């Protein structure tokens, strides 16, 4: 049912000689969801913290091939405005929005969809 996933503790990089002549030859892309065709060239997800991922960060990391998760530490209306700005710039499949688990999570999720 669940795909195998790796965390930082599962990976060890050992320095060694390489025949690669340019870092442009390396492909670090990966599927986020192969069944939906969600491929990311940059396998980095920006944390949904107000000091990390707002509108600008979500747009820029999306342009580079990563994924930004917009924080929820504002009103539902403001988060929807942020989402609209991001969709205008990079489309709807290159970012996400945190909704939390407290009082307004259902209203927030409904408004964002």
What is each stretch, according to the model?
Residues 1-44:
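An N-cap/entry alpha-helix motif that binds or orients negatively charged groups
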Residues 2-5, 11, 53-113:
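Alpha/beta enzyme core
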Residues 26-71:
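N-terminal cofactor/phosphate-binding cores enriched in small/glycine residues
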């Amino acid at each position: 049912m669940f795909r195998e996933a790796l965390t930082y503790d599962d990976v060890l990089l050992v320095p060694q000689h390489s025949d690669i002549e340019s870092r442009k030859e390396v492909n670090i892309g990966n599927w986020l969801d192969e069944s939906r065709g969600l491929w990311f060239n940059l396998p980095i997800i920006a944390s949904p913290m107000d000091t990390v991922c707002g509108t600008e960060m979500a747009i820029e990391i999306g342009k580079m091939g990563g994924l930004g998760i917009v924080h929820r530490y504002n009103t539902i209306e403001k988060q929807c405005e942020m989402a609209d700005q991001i969709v205008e710039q990079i489309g709807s499949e290159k970012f996400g929005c945190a909704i939390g688990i407290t009082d307004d999570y259902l209203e927030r999720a409904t408004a964002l969809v």
